[in-house]
């Protein structure tokens, strides 16, 4: 359990370090299920569709992308937990790929080291909360709308 906790802290520390290097706001580790939620009413409708229990997911791949919100991120080979949740919300998952972002930006962070990040995986994380945020490009402006604790 100690090694797992250390790896989880390394994920959080990586997010903070990358944000500081790039002069950006840090964010809490998370997986985005859907976007364009801007009211508590919409959030509650979505949460009512989700009768999900907490789940453990193993992230086993580090990836880099071309978009601002998918610059450096972790992926799981088994995305069924996320796809099942998104299917309940949207009916059919879009081209979205479930991931846990480590860095937002137009370019890779200065200290990006794939080898260092690969030492963190596989990492097992338990998802026990769904929190809905009104988000945008400026992380410091994100506002929590509501939270659901999972059984």
Which ranges hold each PLM region?
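Intrinsic, low-complexity N-terminal interaction/targeting segments
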Residues: 81-90, 94
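Short, recurring structural edge motifs at helix starts
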Residues: 15-21, 117-119
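Hydrophobic, ordered structural segments
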Residues: 16, 78-81
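Short, conserved charged micro-motifs
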Residues: 8, 39-45, 81-84, 108-114
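Extracellular/lumenal glycan-associated surfaces
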Residues: 25-36, 94-106
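Short, charge-patterned binding micro-sites
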Residues: 21-37, 52-77
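Single conserved hydrophobic/aromatic residue that forms the stacking wall/gate
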Residues: 1-11
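Flexible phosphate-binding patches that engage nucleotides and nucleic acids
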Residues: 44-68, 95, 101-151
